[in-house]
Every structure is written in structure tokens, then in C-alpha cells.
């Protein structure tokens, strides 16, 4: 190791130099801002507080997974803006992290970071998800996870990745029924 590469090698081991650290930090900042902004609930948040009073196999037109996850958060933190915000922004951090991992299958670290970070430019993720969305965030995270696993399978097929892809697709369908479009598109792409 030369003197010119020593700082670079050291900095690559520091946690704050990794993109996943920043995705988590931004999500925690969003949680803090949501808690400071208002104790009032948005439409989807109020719906979750109502639905998480009991476990069911479905909630209105929505499949159950998001509400089950929210129920678990409420068991730990109580039915609160904190519990709602931690789940939502935790799933957003997971979404960006899974897209980063998918990007790493095709790009270098910098390219994968920008592929993931650029998702904030889509109004559905960059604005509406922070304001008031629930199931859409979960299905987007599962779509990013499925994309990452499919890319891993294409490059290095392993039984574990196939099992994980099946699990993620199952979670996607339990998160929002529109995941069927993602699964169908992935199947068509894999067959071509």
C-alpha cells in the first residue's frame, strides 16, 4: 500500500462512507421530521391505526402484510406516529438499499449509488411516499428486492437465491396485489 492509497483504503472501511449508511441516516432524519411536524395522522396512517386493532387476512381492498408489519410495530412502540413513521421510512431505506444492491450486480459502487438515489426523483418515491403512502412503499421494496435477486440468479444461479426470490415474490403479493404485474414482467424478461 502506497502513501497515496492509504487514506482511500482507510476511508473505504469507515461506515459513513458506505451508501447504505446514508440511506439509513436519511430515513432516520425523515422519522425525526415527521415526529416534529405534526401529531395529526394522514389518511393512510389513520387507516393503519384503525386496521391494526386486530389481525386479519385482508383489510378492505388491501392484502394484509403491511398492516401485519404495522401491527408488530404498534406492539413495540404503541399505536403512534413514531410506530407509523418507523415502518414507512424503514421500508423506504430498504427500498433504496435493495435498488443499490441490484445496481451493484451491474455497476460499480458509484453507479449503483446513483441508480438508487435517483429513485427519489420519481414523485411516487421522492414526495408521495414521504407524505402518505403505505402499501406502495412495501411493494416497491419487494420489487427492488426481486430485481436484485433476479440479477443475482442470472449471474450466479444458486438454490438459496431462487428460494429468496420466491419468498420476496410472496411478500410482494401479500403487500399489494399489483405486484403480480412485477412478477409477470420478470417472468417474461427471464424467458426472453
Predicted ranges, named:
Residues 128-138:
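Short acidic/glycine- and proline-prone juxtamembrane loop motifs at membrane-interface regions
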Amino acid at each position: 500500500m502506497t502513501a497515496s492509497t492509504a487514506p482511500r483504503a482507510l476511508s473505504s472501511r469507515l461506515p459513513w462512507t458506505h451508501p447504505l449508511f446514508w440511506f439509513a441516516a436519511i430515513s432516520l432524519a425523515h422519522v425525526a421530521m415527521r415526529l416534529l411536524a405534526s401529531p395529526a395522522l394522514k389518511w393512510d396512517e389513520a387507516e393503519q391505526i384503525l386496521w391494526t386493532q386486530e389481525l386479519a387476512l385482508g383489510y378492505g381492498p388491501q392484502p394484509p402484510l403491511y398492516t401485519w408489519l404495522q401491527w408488530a410495530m404498534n406492539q413495540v412502540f404503541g399505536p403512534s406516529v413514531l410506530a407509523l413513521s418507523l415502518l414507512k421510512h424503514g421500508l423506504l431505506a430498504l427500498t433504496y438499499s435493495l435498488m443499490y444492491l441490484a445496481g451493484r450486480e451491474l455497476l460499480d459502487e458509484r453507479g449503483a449509488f446513483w441508480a438508487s438515489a435517483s429513485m427519489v426523483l420519481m414523485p411516487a418515491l421522492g414526495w408521495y411516499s414521504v407524505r402518505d403512502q403505505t402499501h406502495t412503499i412495501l411493494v416497491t421494496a419487494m420489487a427492488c428486492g426481486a430485481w436484485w435477486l433476479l440479477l443475482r440468479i442470472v449471474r450466479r444461479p444458486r438454490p438459496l437465491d431462487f428460494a429468496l426470490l420466491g419468498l420476496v415474490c410472496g411478500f410482494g403479493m401479500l403487500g399489494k396485489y399489483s405486484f403480480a404485474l412485477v412478477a409477470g414482467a420478470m417472468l417474461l424478461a427471464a424467458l426472453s
